[in-house]
């Protein structure tokens, strides 16, 4: 993060990459591990520290600003169901299978939406909400912030909506973020804030 590469001549660009997103998936022969690289004009990606990020994402072809990371799963799923002209119980929500998501999983299940748990790989999880794979309607959960930027870059290419917020577990992480130019530690990031 923040590493300078290249010869110094030519256009300046931001490069975001993860040589193996879903390491455990790959090691165990599971699906959806990815090698991911994205490029934008200088300043085009959120320069995020290696911390967690709360994320919510949906696919393309839907009314703008349909999701809000500050709203409950019930509100977000109600709006999504209305936009898709279906019932909430027809929706599939993908969530990383982590102890930290126990309350979130319970709240989504209370809405009667279906929950699919994944072991790893939230970039692939967010891409699964797009037209390329209509089996997932929404992705919600907390995962790595750099993966959030990569997922946002993918959605900018394929289409979709996403919001994120950095999550800090301690003062060291907050200080690191401030040192990287993050001024509002509670800021809600839109898709275009993450990857423009």
Predicted region positions:
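An extended, acidic
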Residues: 71-196
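A short glycine/serine-rich beta->alpha loop
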Residues: 24, 63-65, 139
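Flexible, acidic active-site loops/lids enriched in D/E/S/T/G that coordinate Mg2+ and/or position polar
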Residues: 1-40
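A generic short-segment signal for beta-strand/edge and adjacent turn/coil regions
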Residues: 3-9, 60-66, 109-111, 167-174
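Short capping/connector residues at structural and topological boundaries
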Residues: 10, 30, 39, 58-63, ...
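Flexible glycine-/small-residue-enriched beta->alpha junction loops
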Residues: 40-68
